[in-house]
Every structure is written in C-alpha cells, then in structure tokens.
Amino acid sequence: MAESTKGDAAIFPVDTRFQQMARRPGGVPRERALDGAQRHIDELKPDFNHWLSRELKQLATSIQQVGDNPGDEAVLELAHQACRQLRDVCGTMGYELVTFIADNFCEILDAIKAGATYDQNVVDCYMDALALARTDAYRKLRPEQVPEMTNGLRRMVELAVASAPRDVK
C-alpha cells in the first residue's frame, strides 16, 4: 500500500460555459446591453395593462377549473404556470406588489400540489389581492407599504404549507 504524501491540494477555479462566453471578445458592452433592455421594457409598458388583464382572466379561469376538480394535476399545473408567468413578468415590469402576491400564490399552489387542502376562501383572497394590486392606487406600491395585506397573505401561505402532508420515513 502506498503512503500518502502530505501536501496542499491545488485549488484552481474553472470557468463555467457562461463565464467563458461572457469573456469572449466581441459582443455588446454591459452598459449598452442594459440600456437596450431597459428601453425595450419601457416600450412594452403601455401595453402591459392589457396583458395583465388578460393574464389575470386566464389565471381566474384556471383557478375556477382547479376549484371544480382540485385533484386534477394537469389543471393545477396550468394554474400554477399562469401564476408563475404573472409573477415573473410583473417582477420584470416593476410591479412589486403584484409580484409578491403572485409569488405567495405560487407557494399556495405548490402546497396544494403537495397534498394540502384546496381552500376556496384562500384562493378568492389571493385573486382579490391580485385584482386590488393592479389598480392605479396600489400598482406602484411595494409589499412593505401594505403590511396588513402582506402579513395576512404570508400567514395563509404558512397555514397552507403546514397543512400539506409530510413524508415520514
């Protein structure tokens, strides 16, 4: 059996493919790329309210189908997908409160997927909160500016997650 030698291991970083691509010559300078992206977002904002209305209607339709049959995984996945899209796009567009509500609603849907009880009152509360958050009075607010609402929504997530069955091994 060979004896091991004492010594320090040589640790060296290895660039990921993304890091290699980011450092390659050519391309667009970072600041110019960010300016271009922001300009594109600003161009999309006038049509955003129409998009948001359409997405909320789609989410409401999906949620109605989940309410009709909470055990249907395909219907639940469609609702979850609509909610995730709402969360992601609203985050990009700067609608922090809508993003917060949609993110918490995604957690509720995750809990239902994990076996938590479907509670129509919780779902209605989240849909009402989304409708309120998209109004002119609430649109530009951050979650910390409406603590009563956000604390209540967080509490509902905690209860939903706690009600999901846990795998005991």
Where do the PLM segments sit?
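Generic structural signal for well-ordered, non-transmembrane alpha-helical segments
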Residues: 46, 50-53, 57, 77, ...
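Structural secondary-structure packing elements that flank or coincide with functional cores
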Residues: 2-25, 127-166
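Long, amphipathic alpha-helical coiled-coil segments characteristic
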Residues: 30-77
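Extended, amphipathic alpha-helices with heptad-repeat/coiled-coil or helix-bundle character
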Residues: 74-111
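Residue-level signal for short amphipathic helical patches enriched in basic/charged
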Residues: 47, 93-96, 137-140
